[in-house]
Structures are given as structure tokens and as C-alpha cells.
A protein has these predicted regions:
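N-terminal accessory regions of nucleic-acid-interacting proteins
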Residues: 1-45, 127, 200
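Short acidic, Gly/Ser-rich segments with clustered Asp/Glu that frequently serve as metal-coordination loops
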Residues: 46, 51-61
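Short His-Asn-centered micro-motif
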Residues: 49-51, 78-81, 102-106
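A short alpha/beta connector and helix-capping loop motif
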Residues: 57-74
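Short active-site oxyanion
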Residues: 96-101
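A short alpha->loop->secondary-structure connector
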Residues: 117-125
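Short alpha-helix plus adjacent loop in nuclease-associated cores
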Residues: 128-150
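Acidic, Mg2+-coordinating catalytic module of metal-dependent nucleases/exonucleases
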Residues: 150-200
Length: 200
């Protein structure tokens, strides 16, 4: 059965409203709200994007369990493996070339979404490339989100290994998983916003 819970995740002194859901209707409502709030500047919309899956310690393939999206202080954590359906609104949102979906290693995340769910991310922007270019730091091309967030935002993201390699396909996610999933997408959004708009 599809479920939706809304959490307030704290990061660097601010709250991020985080919708954790397996409901297609709730995903549509989240997308509709983002489009409504940002309707005057949709051509400049930046969206933090990340995915999670249960790591395999051996051969095989683990399907994408979560899709995380973040715009401003609104974050969506969509439990793909438990979803009742994938709404057309999400497909259209991801496929709109006007919106920039930002993340580290985002091309690989987009490929996973296409292979697993047939979701096309039309405009994926890799923050490692942008950070290296904008900051004149070629070393950031191979950096992870933690190092890039430190360089761009001056923040330290806590990424505990026990959570990172945890059971992302669980129906009930732990508070630590929700915080990790939300902050990854939020920080991707913030780094993208700073680098692409020059607005600190």
C-alpha cells in the first residue's frame, strides 16, 4: 500500500520539508507545488537529483530504490520499488529540457532511472564538471559530493558508511536514511544554485 510521510530535516540551522512517499499521487502533488511556487522562473529551475539502491557485495544488479529531488527547501524522496505507479507529471518534469537536474555523477543516475523505470532526465548537469570549471579546480572533476560541498559551500556533510551502504529498498526507512537521502539532494541543489547562478 502506498504511503506518504512528511518530515522536517534540519541542516546547517535550517529545516528542509521532506516528503517520503511510495504514492504516485503524492509525487504528482509535490511536482505541481514546485511548478506553482516557481512558475515565474521555470526557465531557470535548478533541481537537485540523487538516487539510492541497496548495494550488492557480489555479482548481480540492484535496481534503483529511491529517487530524491530537491528544489529550495522542498525535498522529495520517492520509493520507486514500492510505488503504486509512476505519475506522468514526474515523467514530464524530468523530461523538460528547461529544467537543470544537478548532482555529482548525475549522468549515471539518469542512466539508472532510464534503465530501471523508463524515466528520461533531459538536462542532467554534473556538478563535478561545473565546480572544476567555475572554481578553476581540475581536482574537483573526480571529487564526490562531500568534497564539492566543502569547496563550494564550506559545509561538512556527514555521510556515515553504515547508512550509505544500507537497505535502501526497505519499505520503512530509518530516520538516518531519510536525513541522508534528503541532505544529498538538498546539497546538490545548493551547490548547483551557487555555481550556476553565482548567488551565494
Amino acid at each position: 500500500m502506498a504511503k506518504t510521510d512528511v518530515y522536517s530535516v534540519m541542516f546547517e540551522g535550517g529545516a528542509i520539508t521532506t516528503t517520503v512517499t511510495s504514492s504516485g499521487a503524492s509525487v504528482k502533488a509535490w511536482v505541481d507545488e514546485v511548478l506553482s511556487v516557481h512558475r515565474r522562473r521555470l526557465r531557470d529551475l535548478i533541481v537537485g537529483l540523487d538516487v539510492e539502491w541497496r548495494p550488492l557485495f557480489g555479482p548481480g544488479y540492484s535496481p534503483t530504490a529511491l529517487l530524491q529531488l530537491c528544489v529550495g527547501r522542498r525535498c522529495l524522496v520517492f520509493q520507486l520499488l514500492h510505488a503504486d505507479y509512476i505519475p506522468a507529471a514526474l515523467k514530464e518534469f524530468l523530461a523538460d529540457p528547461d529544467y537543470r537536474f544537478v548532482g555529482v555523477g548525475v549522468a549515471a543516475d539518469a542512466a539508472r532511472l532510464w534503465n530501471d523505470q523508463g524515466l528520461n532526465v533531459a538536462n542532467a548537469v554534473d556538478l563535478a564538471e561545473v565546480a572544476a570549471e567555475e572554481m578553476g579546480r581540475p581536482d574537483l572533476r573526480n571529487a564526490g559530493l562531500k568534497a564539492i560541498a566543502s569547496a563550494v559551500m564550506g559545509v561538512d556533510i556527514d555521510k556515515p558508511d553504515a547508512v550509505r551502504v544500507g537497505p535502501w529498498d526497505n519499505y520503512y526507512l530509518s530516520d538516518q536514511q531519510i536525513k541522508y537521502a534528503c541532505i544529498d539532494a538538498f546539497v546538490s541543489f545548493e551547490v548547483g544554485r551557487i555555481l550556476l547562478t553565482g548567488d551565494n
